[in-house]
């Protein structure tokens, strides 16, 4: 193996660099090349970068003593590579660098002596050595090929037949090769020289026709060198085949430095693609070579990404001896390109090639190709295609005769086989070709090539060879000029006597000179040669320039004239006779001056182009000056705008600072005002206790409720946890970034820890929560606090640690110090693993060998009754996931017992319980009143209801409570205080433990005795699924004390299971990434957060919402419409595509460039508190193409305040709800957003956020309606129909009222409070979220972010799982003990119907609606006579009772000041009239329970024809609404995606004219009413949280309509009828599961009573028959 030899060569300054007075930034000393950064101060460390190569050639100044010539470069590199080729190795030399760096000069050189490049010199030296060493035993043969790779297309430069692009293929034996690439045999250097010359001509013709440049294409010249040595003794001939690849790469430059545009830019992109791929290959090979150990999976090298690297695959890291010459520029203006070239060359040094001698390659290759051809023939025969035999190959070009049948199912396989067969036959035919045949084919191709040149008009010599640099002595001629100097003066066209026509090959008259390309006509022009005078005759519409002037009329050409034909063909005209005459007419001195004058400017392609621009009136210097002036003016203008914008921002920030300063001063004044009070101004503590006014007359139940509420809110710490997460996120990101950069393999992430039985805190973290571990003033046991910690995942050692936030900050200081010292460490520094084991590295901590699997708990209350129990308890980890099960036996050891243990381990111990041990460290999780602070999702009152139920004696069965074993007052005789008691704990088996753990053992102890633990022996975990048998017996003797008896009653024993990982230290098992039960939906946050209001330019940033008490809440339905201007001049709502799968549940389909308006309609129940006064502002902003948005977008200029039209109150016939509508003109172009100005691209959705600031009466602030809208913009004339077939066939888009989007909002009214109090300011504190703040090295984290609010929800679910597991374990123990004691002797077992009712109740209890829907009031009545005697009431008594009831209700609502103006009736009159419908507001169990039912009237109270002869009482006078200031809050409700029930119902609304069929959807806690199934817009909303659902026999008998139930809100009532009998229960269960369960339970009891009566009668009759038979 050998590495790639790399040489660097620097060229002299060119004219461009000299004109710009560039400085040399390259220095070479020996093999070291140094480059100086001109943009960095010279004395800094980054100013000079040094690189070491195999060779460094200084070719900058020929006057220097160390100047490197072409010969020196060849002797160092060319001769060595040529020797490798004679040794039988493959050889490759390629030049790399930017355009104009000297690559072509190094590889090809010039025609002058001592200026030849590597390619000509290596070819000349090759034949010199061949002629010197060739003998009869040793013969040589040389073949060459010349190809060009331009824009990933391969062209053959030696064979004119191959006009198209050649195909690059890959053969399993040959590797990548170019199909049909001609290989021509050569016998001497002159043959190679002629082929190179003719190849360059073909390259010139193609480049001129296609307007290409050779510097933008790759040229690959390949020499196939074969040595045949004949051994006379053995009469065997051996071969060595070498392939010499000489590559001239295209220039590597950046688009901005070359000024490339249009086609040139695309060409550069394609060329840079191949060069970029070459760079990737070099980098990948260098990385592979630098690795110490290879991975099992082969490293991927992207050879196939470009044709260049695919063809050079063997030369890059394969079977080849390779050399790279990096050509660089010395000028400072090319610093970036030069540095990039040096870095590529430095990477190429590390590439290792595995070159082998290619001996006898053809014989083996021919044999393997024959085998492959035979396999392909067999495959084609199997497909039914006849193929010719091997002896017929010479008669046919392909081996396929004709297919015997048409294309079958395996057509693709057949075509592939035919293609492979043809390619293999071509290869074997090429390999079997003799040397004489190759020479003959080479001669044929030469003749074809010369004929093609002659046909094109290119001059040829008398022997047929094309004229190269040869200049005729008599005949006028044209010589080509090319942008690439190497391709200039390669083509010569004779102008014969008479007429010489020039055009394309498509002309009707054959043209003498044929050109092709753009702007060349079929008959372009004619040259007339009369008496050595050449006249150019242009044809019509032909583009011709002579000396820069466009030619319209015939003109006589003078020698040296520049002729431009079309746009790309540039020539120089030369007339030898005319030049000779001019020299004879003038004197010698004048001739010398003329010659000097002619020689002064070099007539080349650049000269012709500049001349063309000048003659056309384009002054390059003036144009450049003008462009510079424009750039300078643009710079000044942009700088002025930037300064103006900066000044505006400065003023804005200064205004903010002044406002904050003013706020701070006001707060300080307020605090100083409070501090000015003296202690005498406040009430003394003894005054409060002595003054009767301060005494509270609470009952015991009220004091318990107050203590429960106090503890709940005392430990409610969601906000403080979030503040800790937000404030320390930046430290976590910095630690992770440093860990990645230092390759520590340690990850940091936030976690929440709570000190519970299953998850005790580590000692260092437990100290931080010690102050909370004490009883409060109500005597409650201590409760653990949840704290934020850092989970440290050590993937290197397979360990997990927990750090406090303080420890993270301390370790972070050490990490920063290590990061800064990393650059000073040498590569020979010891491995960090040593430091991680010794604790010297701040990233690592010491870790134990055994890891915790989980914990289990066993209660000991069975020892109070000396009975043994065998428990099967779950092994639970700290996350609340079950990791296995443990079987444990607990039994008392009495004096008369004596058990012999044959197997297992038996141990004894003695413990002493002190009186201090009676108080447990942990407060049990099943004490729900305190743990509920973690698992309470919102302010639900379920715990309060439980407490009330317990207080009233209905929560727990009295019989079960009295029979509970734990309620035993006195222990048995075996537990006498002062005596000793012995009990036995037997650890039997463990099951279900994962296979990742080995050597499992169990350790158990009492909760307060961690230092006195009992341990079993480790057991091997075979992972076969069999139980792990411990069989460990532990006898424990304890002196009986009161604390020990109390412990037996209330506390368990803790069992810890340990094990170590099988695959240590891989961390994939250490993380315990197993599938756990997901949390319920109610524990999760909404999927897409609702956007915050867009900041109003008029109101500015709104203050924080007040924390005062909510006085009233109202449900508001809002409709959003975007209207577009129709041809009739009206604004018509645009089409809306409705779908629950869309983020906004609706998509507006808009047209581009049409005037729009936004229309918003607000619908709600009429109430005195909510009266819309006016619309103040409508703001639209946050234009984006993702559903998520951020408040930072409010700072952009996209926020726009729309022009408003006056709002109006609508009067909808048949609907007495309040409708308020307003519109605003929306000119979307003012946002200056490309998303709104152009037509949306395919699959693109645009999102905006709008906020409407509305003014309400009696409100100090505006109410804000905020909504996210999604839209797609089509063309102006496009049809905006629905995009899905479902909406297309439903036809709902044709309904104009369906083209709106609805939103459900909750309007909360709070009392305006003073914001200056310290308590309010403390509650309004805001902690900056630092998770988005940038830290150094953040880009290495690949988008990782610290966890935030979701972590709190996940921890809630973990605590709830732990709570459930402990409750289940405790209850299982009690049930097992009851069964063991024989207490479960219930004579009436639970029936199937009762079980169904229990299941219904359980399911309802876990649903969110259970938390918010109050049950219908139940009145437990055992004897109706004891409450109210049966009697009939007259009309006056009934009216009096109704009046008292309403007064009581008014007094109840009077507590909420916003509702004290409630009218006598809770509903408003309707315009359509009222139906005679009443429903019961108090549910009754049966008609026999209550003879009199108080009814709520759903119709208007002033209606004369009241039902049942009742007379409506006179309406009470409406009190005047006092002027109060409220603070409104409008919050959008994220409707649940879960549909509990949907279908058609008959709906009778109060005040309605009759029954109407409506489509009803239940999404708890809301019921949505639609007009029909196809109606996508919600027309009405019912909030089940504030409604009562009634379904009773009294109601059915009253309305005399079957299958009905009612939903009554505080504003109106609905009577609903299902379409079938069986649907009533399903609808009730969807709306109120608890009510459905009660009804089903009631029906079940009724069905059981007749059955029990029948059974008793049968038993009585059978007993009577038995008695009579005995008698």
Swiss-Prot record:
The biological process GO terms on file are: synaptic vesicle transport; vesicle transport along microtubule
Bias kind Polar residues: ranges: 395-413
Q: Where does it localize?
A: Cytoplasm, Cytoskeleton
Q: What is its main location?
A: cytoplasm
Q: Name one GO cellular component term.
A: microtubule
Q: Which cysteines are joined by disulfide bonds?
A: none
Task: Please give the coiled-coil regions recorded for this protein.
Answer: 358-437, 577-674
Keyword annotations from UniProtKB, A to Z: ATP-binding, Coiled coil, Cytoplasm, Cytoskeleton, Microtubule, Motor protein, Nucleotide-binding
Q: Where does ATP bind?
A: 97-104
**PROSITE patterns recorded for this chain?**
KINESIN_MOTOR_1 (PS00411), KINESIN_MOTOR_2 (PS50067), PH_DOMAIN (PS50003)
Instruction: Report the SUPFAM superfamilies cross-referenced here.
Output: P-loop containing nucleoside triphosphate hydrolases (SSF52540), PH domain-like (SSF50729), SMAD/FHA domain (SSF49879)
Region entry Disordered: which residue ranges?
391-413, 949-973
Recorded GO MF terms: ATP binding; microtubule binding; microtubule motor activity
Give all residue intervals belonging to the FHA domain. 500-566
**Residues in domain PH?**
1538-1636
**Which residue numbers delimit the Kinesin motor domain?**
3-351
Q: Which InterPro entries match?
A: FHA_dom, Kinesin-like, Kinesin-like_KIF1-typ, Kinesin_assoc, Kinesin_motor_CS, Kinesin_motor_dom, Kinesin_motor_dom_sf, P-loop_NTPase
State the Pfam families in the record.
DUF3694, FHA, KIF1B, Kinesin, Kinesin_assoc, PH
User: What SMART domains does the record tag this protein with?
Assistant: FHA, KISc, PH
* Role, per record: Required for presynaptic maturation, has a role in axonal transport of dense-core vesicles carrying synaptic vesicle precursors, components required for the morphological transformation of axonal growth cones to mature boutons.
Q: How does it assemble?
A: Monomer.
- Name it: Kinesin-like protein unc-104
């Amino acid at each position: 193996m050998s590495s790639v030899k790399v040489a660097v060569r620097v060229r002299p300054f060119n004219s461009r660099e000299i004109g710009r007075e560039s400085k040399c930034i390259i220095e070479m000393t020996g093999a070291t090349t140094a480059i100086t950064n001109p943009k960095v101060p010279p004395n800094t460390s980054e100013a000079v970068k040094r690189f070491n190569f195999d060779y460094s050639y200084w070719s900058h100044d020929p006057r220097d003593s160390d100047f490197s010539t072409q010969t020196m470069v060849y002797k160092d590199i060319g001769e060595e590579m040529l020797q490798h080729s004679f040794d039988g190795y493959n050889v490759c030399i390629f030049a790399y660098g930017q355009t104009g760096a000297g690559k072509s000069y190094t590889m090809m050189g010039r025609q002058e002596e001592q200026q030849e490049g590597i390619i000509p010199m290596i070819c000349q030296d090759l034949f010199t050595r061949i002629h010197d060493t060739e003998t009869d035993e040793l013969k040589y043969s040389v073949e060459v090929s010349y190809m060009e790779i331009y824009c990933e297309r391969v062209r053959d430069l030696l064979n004119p037949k191959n006009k198209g692009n050649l195909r690059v293929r890959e053969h399993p034996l040959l590797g990548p090769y170019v199909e049909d690439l001609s290989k021509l045999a050569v016998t001497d250097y002159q043959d190679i020289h002629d082929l190179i010359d003719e190849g360059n001509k073909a390259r010139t013709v193609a480049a001129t026709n296609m307007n290409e440049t050779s510097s933008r294409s790759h040229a690959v010249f390949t020499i196939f060198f074969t040595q045949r040595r004949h051994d006379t003794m053995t009469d065997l001939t051996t071969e060595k085949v070498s392939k010499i690849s000489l590559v001239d790469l295209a220039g590597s430059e950046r688009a901005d430095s070359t000024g490339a545009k249009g086609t040139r830019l695309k060409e550069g992109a394609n060329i840079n693609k191949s060069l970029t791929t070459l760079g990737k290959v070099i980098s990948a090979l260098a990385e592979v070579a630098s690795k110490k150990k290879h991975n099992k999976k082969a490293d991927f090298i992207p050879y196939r990404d470009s044709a260049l690297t695919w063809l050079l695959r063997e030369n890059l890291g394969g079977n080849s001896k390779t050399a790279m010459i990096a050509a660089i520029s010395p000028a400072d203006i090319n610093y970036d390109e030069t540095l990039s070239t040096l870095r590529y060359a430095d990477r190429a040094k590390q590439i290792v090639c595995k070159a082998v001698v290619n001996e006898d390659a053809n014989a083996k290759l021919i044999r393997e190709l024959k085998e492959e051809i035979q396999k392909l023939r067999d495959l084609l025969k199997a497909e039914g295609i006849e193929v010719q035999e091997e002896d017929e190959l010479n008669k046919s070009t392909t081996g396929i005769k004709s297919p015997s049948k048409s294309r079958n199912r395996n057509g693709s396989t057949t075509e592939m086989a035919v293609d492979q067969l043809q390619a293999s036959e071509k290869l074997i035919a090429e390999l079997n070709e003799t040397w004489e045949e190759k020479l003959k084919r080479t001669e044929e191709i030469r003749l074809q090539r010369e004929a093609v040149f002659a046909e094109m008009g290119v001059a040829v010599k008398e022997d047929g060879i094309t004229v190269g640099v040869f200049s005729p002595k008599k005949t006028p001629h044209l010589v080509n000029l090319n942008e690439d100097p190497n391709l200039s003066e390669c083509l010569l066209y004779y102008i014969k006597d008479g007429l010489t026509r020039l055009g394309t090959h498509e002309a009707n008259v054959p043209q003498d000179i044929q050109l092709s390309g753009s702007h060349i006509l079929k008959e372009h022009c004619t040259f007339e040669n009369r008496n050595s005078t050449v006249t150019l005759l242009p044809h019509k519409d032909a583009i011709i320039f002579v000396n820069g002037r466009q030619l319209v009329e015939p003109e006589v050409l003078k020698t040296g004239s520049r002729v431009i034909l079309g746009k790309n063909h540039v020539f120089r005209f030369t007339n030898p006779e005319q030049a000779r005459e001019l020299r004879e007419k003038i004197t010698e001195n004048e001739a010398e001056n003329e010659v000097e004058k002619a020689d002064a400017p070099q007539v080349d392609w650049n000269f012709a182009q500049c001349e063309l621009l000048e003659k056309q009136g384009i002054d390059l210097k003036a144009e450049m000056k003008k462009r510079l002036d424009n750039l300078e003016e643009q710079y000044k203008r942009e700088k002025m705008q930037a300064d103006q914008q900066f000044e505006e921002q400065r003023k804005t920030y200064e205004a903010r600072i002044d406002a904050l300063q003013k706020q701070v001063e006001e707060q300080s004044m307020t605090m100083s005002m409070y501090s000015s009070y003296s202690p005498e101004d406040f009430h003394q503590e003894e005054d409060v206790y002595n003054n009767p006014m301060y005494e509270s007359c609470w009952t015991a139940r009220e004091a318990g409720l107050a203590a429960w509420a106090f503890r709940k809110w005392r430990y409610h710490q969601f906000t403080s946890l979030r503040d800790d997460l937000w404030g320390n996120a930046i430290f976590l990101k910095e630690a992770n970034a440093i860990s990645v950069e230092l390759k520590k393999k340690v990850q940091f992430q936030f976690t929440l820890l709570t000190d519970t039985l299953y998850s005790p805190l580590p000692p260092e973290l437990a100290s931080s929560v010690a102050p909370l571990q004490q009883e409060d003033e109500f005597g409650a046991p201590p409760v653990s606090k949840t704290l934020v910690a850092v989970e440290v995942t050590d993937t290197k050692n397979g360990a997990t640690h927990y750090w406090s936030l303080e420890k993270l900050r301390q370790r972070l200081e050490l990490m920063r110090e290590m990061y800064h010292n990393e650059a000073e460490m040498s590569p020979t520094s010891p491995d960090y693993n040593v430091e991680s084991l010794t604790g010297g590295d701040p990233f690592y901590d010491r870790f134990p060998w055994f890891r915790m699997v989980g914990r289990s708990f066993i209660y000991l209350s069975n020892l109070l009754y000396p009975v043994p129990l065998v428990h099967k308890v779950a092994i639970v980890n700290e996350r609340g996931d079950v990791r296995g099960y443990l079987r444990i036996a607990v039994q008392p050891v009495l004096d008369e017992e004596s058990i012999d243990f044959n197997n297992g381990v038996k141990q004894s111990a003695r413990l002493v319980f002190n009186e201090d041990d009676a108080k447990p460290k942990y407060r049990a999780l099943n004490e729900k009143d305190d743990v509920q602070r973690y698992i309470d999702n919102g302010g639900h009152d379920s715990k309060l209801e439980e407490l009330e139920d317990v207080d009233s004696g209905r929560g727990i069965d009295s019989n079960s409570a009295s029979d509970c074993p734990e309620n035993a007052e006195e222990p048995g005789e075996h537990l006498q205080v002062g005596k000793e008691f012995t009990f036995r704990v037997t650890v039997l088996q463990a099951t279900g433990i994962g296979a990742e753990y080995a050597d499992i053992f169990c350790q158990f102890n009492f909760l307060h005795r961690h230092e006195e633990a009992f341990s079993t022996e480790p057991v091997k975990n075979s992972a076969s699924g069999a139980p792990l048998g411990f069989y460990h017996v532990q006898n424990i003797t304890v002196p009986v004390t009161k604390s020990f008896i109390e412990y037996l009653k209330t506390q368990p024993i803790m069992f810890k299971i340990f094990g170590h990982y099988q695959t240590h230290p891989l961390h994939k098992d250490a993380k315990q990434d197993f599938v756990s039960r997901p949390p319920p939906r109610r524990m999760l946050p909404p999927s897409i957060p609702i956007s915050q209001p867009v900041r109003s330019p008029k109101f500015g940033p709104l203050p924080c919402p007040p924390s005062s008490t909510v006085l009233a809440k109202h449900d508001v339905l809002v409709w959003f419409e975007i209207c577009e201007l129709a041809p009739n001049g009206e604004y018509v709502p645009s089409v809306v595509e409705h779908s629950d799968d869309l983020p906004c549940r609706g998509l507006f389909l808009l047209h581009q460039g049409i005037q729009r308006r936004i229309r918003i309609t607000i619908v709600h129940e009429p109430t005195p508190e909510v009266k819309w006064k006016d619309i103040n502002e409508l703001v639209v902003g946050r234009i984006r193409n993702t559903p998520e948005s951020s408040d930072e977008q409010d700072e952009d200029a996209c926020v726009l305040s729309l022009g408003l039209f006056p709002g109006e109150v609508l009067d909808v016939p048949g609907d007495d709800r309040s409708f308020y509508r307003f519109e605003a003109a929306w000119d979307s172009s003012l946002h200056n957003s490309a998303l709104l100005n152009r037509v949306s691209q395919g699959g693109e959705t645009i999102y905006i956020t709008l906020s409407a600031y509305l003014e309400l009466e009696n409100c100090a602030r505006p109410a804000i309606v905020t909504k996210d809208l999604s839209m797609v913009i089509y063309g102006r004339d496009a049809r905006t129909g629905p995009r899905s077939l479902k909406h297309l066939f439903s036809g709902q888009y044709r309904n104009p009222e369906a083209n709106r989007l609805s939103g459900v909002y909750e309007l909360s009214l709070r009392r305006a409070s003073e914001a200056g109090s310290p308590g309010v300011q403390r509650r309004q504190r805001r902690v900056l979220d630092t998770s988005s703040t940038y830290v150094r090295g953040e880009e290495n984290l690949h988008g990782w972010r610290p966890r935030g609010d979701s972590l709190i929800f996940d921890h809630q679910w973990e605590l709830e799982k732990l709570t459930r597991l402990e409750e289940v374990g405790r209850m299982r123990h009690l049930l097992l003990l009851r069964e063991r004691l024989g207490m479960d002797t219930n004579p009436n077992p639970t029936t199937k119907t009762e079980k169904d009712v229990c299941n219904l109740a359980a399911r309802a209890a876990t649903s969110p609606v259970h938390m918010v829907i109050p049950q219908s009031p139940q009145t437990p009545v055992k004897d109706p006579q004891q409450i109210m005697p049966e009697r009939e009431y007259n009309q006056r008594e009934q009216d009096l009772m109704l009046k008292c009831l309403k007064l009581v209700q008014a007094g109840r609502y009077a507590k909420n000041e916003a509702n004290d103006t409630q009218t006598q009736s809770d509903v408003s009159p309707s315009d359509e009239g009222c139906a005679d419908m009443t429903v019961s507001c108090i549910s009754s169990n049966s008609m026999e329970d209550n003879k009199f039912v108080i009814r709520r009237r759903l119709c208007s109270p002033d209606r004369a024809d009241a039902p049942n002869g009742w007379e409506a009482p006179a309406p009470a006078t409406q009190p005047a609404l006092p002027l109060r200031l409220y603070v409104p809050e409008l919050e959008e409700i994220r409707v649940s995606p879960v549909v509990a029930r949907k279908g058609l119902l008959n709906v009778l609304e109060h005040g309605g004219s009759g029954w109407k069929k409506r489509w009803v959807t239940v999404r708890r806690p809301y019921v949505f009413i639609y007009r029909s199934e196809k109606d996508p817009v919600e027309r009405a909303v019912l909030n089940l949280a504030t409604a009562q659902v009634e379904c009773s026999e009294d109601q059915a008998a009253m309305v005399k309509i079957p299958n009905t139930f009612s939903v009554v809100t505080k504003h109106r009532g609905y009577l609903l009828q299902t379409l079938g009998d069986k649907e009533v229960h399903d609808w009730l269960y969807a709306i109120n599961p608890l009510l459905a369960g009660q009804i089903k339970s009631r029906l079940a009891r009724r069905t059981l009573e007749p059955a029990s009566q029948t059974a008793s009668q049968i038993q009585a009759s059978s007993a009577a028959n038995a008695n009579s038979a005995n008698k």
